[in-house]
Amino acid sequence: RNNVALCIAEGFEKDFSILCKDNQKVADAITTGLNMERFYVADIKGDIAGVLAISDCNGRAARAEKASLKKHFGFIKGIIGTFILKEEFEKQLEYPITTGYIEFVAVRKKYRKQGIAATMLQESMLLTNYQDFVLDVTDINNNAIKCYTSIGFEEFKRIPEKHGKQKGFNEKIFMRYCHK
């Protein structure tokens, strides 16, 4: 569980940096909120190389655990983190039960640029019963956009990001994959 959290912390290092720049501390803070039943893991010789989760309208892959966030980030940043992450992690998905929502796609730095994310996506989608899949990505994450496009995801919506300047991106791009 902690290794999955560490992979997420490293993969979303820039996003978590406003709360904490220490990946291990971020991992410790989010570990208790992970719903491991929703995660898929790429393992290379016993080392977690990458992770992703598939959620749906019946439940998400993570919760913002206020006590853990306060413990690891301090009182003020813990409260701020809870507020920010609750929206990101726990918002009810409005997609039908036939749609899988892919989130937390992350590959450890030492394993990047080896096709691991694409392989994880393809394999995990085959293991589910969803008819289609949706994910979102920031407009500045060009490597992820290329990866998703290469396996058949297509953009269907863009939403301007509130406080985008502070977050370092302007829009969230929503992409869909439909089984053929």
Regions found by a protein language model. Give the residues of each.
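Helix-loop element at the rim of GNAT/NAT acetyltransferase active sites that forms part
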Residues: 5-21, 58-60
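Active-site rim helix/loop that mediates acceptor-substrate recognition in acyltransferases
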Residues: 19-39, 44-45, 53, 59
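Glycine-rich phosphate/pyrophosphate-binding loop shared by adenosine-nucleotide-utilizing enzymes
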Residues: 46-51, 100
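Conserved acyl-CoA
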Residues: 88-97, 119-132
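Conserved acetyl-CoA-binding loop-helix of GNAT-fold acetyltransferases
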Residues: 109, 113-126, 146-150
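C-terminal "cap" of GNAT-fold acetyltransferases
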Residues: 131-145, 151, 161-180
